[in-house]
Amino acid sequence: MIAECIKKVASHSDLSVYEAKGAMQDIMSGNATDGQIGAFLTALVMKGETSSEIAAFASVMRENAVQITPKRNGMLVDTCGTGGDGKNTFNISTAAAFTAAGAGVTVVKHGNRGATSKCGSADVLEALGIKIDISPERVCEIIDENGIGFMFAQSHHPAMKYAGKVRKEIGIRSFFNLIGPLSNPAGADAQLLGVYDSPLTEKIAEVLNILGTKRAMVVHGDGYDEITTTGITQVSEVNDGQVRSYSLDPSSFGFQKADAASLFGGDSQYNAHIIRSVLSGDEGPRRDIVILNAAAAIYLGERAGSIADGIKYAEKSIDSGLALEKLENLILLSGGKNDS
């Protein structure tokens, strides 16, 4: 299948859902050669991937994942980004995940080690003392008990090994950078998903809609794959089959405009220190951006009727110590080590 698809894509023709799924299954099953994978990825980048193609690729990745089924106490929410924005911030969506969990949202956090940054979510969680390479069954138990757990992508997507070498060798951004965040192994009902380029907000929202995601906010703010406090964020929101796009201004929620330098991160140990400081109540621009992103996750998880209400719940989560408690519990339950 993939050989025929390469020819079609090279002629700048779009793939049908059947063709896209077939090509992706060839990759995920190890039936495609490295040369075929490289040619396919390159041709797709040159043509440009359609929403239906990306959805088809993601659906196959989901089918090949080691999935888990946590108990549903309301919506299951994931907070993640594509990475690749080049901003080198601390791990904002990871801090927001603990804050949302402290507000009563069940968070099924999915992530990996950093590819384009010094520190991915897996790296910073490990630096915080969390054991990340645990069985999927144990992750499911932790989510049920703690209301937040972490699914390490390498443990849940073993078939990705077939594409890993080629992706590194060709060194170009491809649909694989997009479908990881679209392939939550717990079947998240709602997602706060940051993308590295503004035009992707609508396209990825369309993909999530095709995949049946109940609620989502796909965001890109002032160059960040986050809701930002440095400027305006472009949002494409999915809500029960409908997609609407709008701009979000942090000043309308009372946040001061942040300077980009105040959001810089570093290596995993440095970023872990920042997250623990924010969850411990330190104030300033780092707290502000975590609060704003957590508020969106709380809103998507239907624990708040609006982002404005979500901000109040996020602030309470941190100030009450509940967000930090979720972190401490995850360290303990994962069998990790707390060095704080």
Curated annotation (Swiss-Prot):
<dbReference type="Pfam" id="PF02885">
    <property type="entry name" value="Glycos_trans_3N"/>
</dbReference>
<feature type="binding site">
    <location>
        <position position="81"/>
    </location>
    <ligand>
        <name>5-phospho-alpha-D-ribose 1-diphosphate</name>
    </ligand>
</feature>
<feature type="binding site">
    <location>
        <position position="89"/>
    </location>
    <ligand>
        <name>5-phospho-alpha-D-ribose 1-diphosphate</name>
    </ligand>
</feature>
<feature type="binding site">
    <location>
        <position position="93"/>
    </location>
    <ligand>
        <name>Mg(2+) 1</name>
    </ligand>
</feature>
<feature type="binding site">
    <location>
        <position position="226"/>
    </location>
    <ligand>
        <name>Mg(2+) 2</name>
    </ligand>
</feature>
<feature type="binding site">
    <location>
        <position position="225"/>
    </location>
    <ligand>
        <name>Mg(2+) 2</name>
    </ligand>
</feature>
<dbReference type="Pfam" id="PF00591">
    <property type="entry name" value="Glycos_transf_3"/>
</dbReference>
<dbReference type="InterPro" id="IPR017459">
    <property type="entry name" value="Glycosyl_Trfase_fam3_N_dom"/>
</dbReference>
<feature type="binding site">
    <location>
        <begin position="109"/>
        <end position="117"/>
    </location>
    <ligand>
        <name>5-phospho-alpha-D-ribose 1-diphosphate</name>
    </ligand>
</feature>
<feature type="binding site">
    <location>
        <position position="112"/>
    </location>
    <ligand>
        <name>anthranilate 1</name>
    </ligand>
</feature>
<dbReference type="GO" id="GO:0005829">
    <property type="term" value="C:cytosol"/>
</dbReference>
<keyword id="KW-0460">Magnesium</keyword>
<dbReference type="GO" id="GO:0004048">
    <property type="term" value="F:anthranilate phosphoribosyltransferase activity"/>
</dbReference>
<feature type="binding site">
    <location>
        <position position="81"/>
    </location>
    <ligand>
        <name>anthranilate 1</name>
    </ligand>
</feature>
<dbReference type="InterPro" id="IPR000312">
    <property type="entry name" value="Glycosyl_Trfase_fam3"/>
</dbReference>
<comment type="similarity">
    <text>Belongs to the anthranilate phosphoribosyltransferase family.</text>
</comment>
<dbReference type="InterPro" id="IPR005940">
    <property type="entry name" value="Anthranilate_Pribosyl_Tfrase"/>
</dbReference>
<keyword id="KW-0479">Metal-binding</keyword>
<feature type="binding site">
    <location>
        <position position="167"/>
    </location>
    <ligand>
        <name>anthranilate 2</name>
    </ligand>
</feature>
<feature type="binding site">
    <location>
        <begin position="91"/>
        <end position="94"/>
    </location>
    <ligand>
        <name>5-phospho-alpha-D-ribose 1-diphosphate</name>
    </ligand>
</feature>
<keyword id="KW-0822">Tryptophan biosynthesis</keyword>
<feature type="binding site">
    <location>
        <position position="121"/>
    </location>
    <ligand>
        <name>5-phospho-alpha-D-ribose 1-diphosphate</name>
    </ligand>
</feature>
<keyword id="KW-0328">Glycosyltransferase</keyword>
<feature type="binding site">
    <location>
        <begin position="84"/>
        <end position="85"/>
    </location>
    <ligand>
        <name>5-phospho-alpha-D-ribose 1-diphosphate</name>
    </ligand>
</feature>
<keyword id="KW-0057">Aromatic amino acid biosynthesis</keyword>
<dbReference type="GO" id="GO:0000162">
    <property type="term" value="P:L-tryptophan biosynthetic process"/>
</dbReference>
<comment type="function">
    <text>Catalyzes the transfer of the phosphoribosyl group of 5-phosphorylribose-1-pyrophosphate (PRPP) to anthranilate to yield N-(5'-phosphoribosyl)-anthranilate (PRA).</text>
</comment>
<feature type="binding site">
    <location>
        <position position="226"/>
    </location>
    <ligand>
        <name>Mg(2+) 1</name>
    </ligand>
</feature>
<dbReference type="GO" id="GO:0000287">
    <property type="term" value="F:magnesium ion binding"/>
</dbReference>
<dbReference type="InterPro" id="IPR035902">
    <property type="entry name" value="Nuc_phospho_transferase"/>
</dbReference>
<comment type="pathway">
    <text>Amino-acid biosynthesis; L-tryptophan biosynthesis; L-tryptophan from chorismate: step 2/5.</text>
</comment>
<keyword id="KW-0028">Amino-acid biosynthesis</keyword>
<protein>
    <recommendedName>
        <fullName>Anthranilate phosphoribosyltransferase</fullName>
        <ecNumber>2.4.2.18</ecNumber>
    </recommendedName>
</protein>
<keyword id="KW-0808">Transferase</keyword>
<dbReference type="InterPro" id="IPR036320">
    <property type="entry name" value="Glycosyl_Trfase_fam3_N_dom_sf"/>
</dbReference>
<comment type="subunit">
    <text>Homodimer.</text>
</comment>
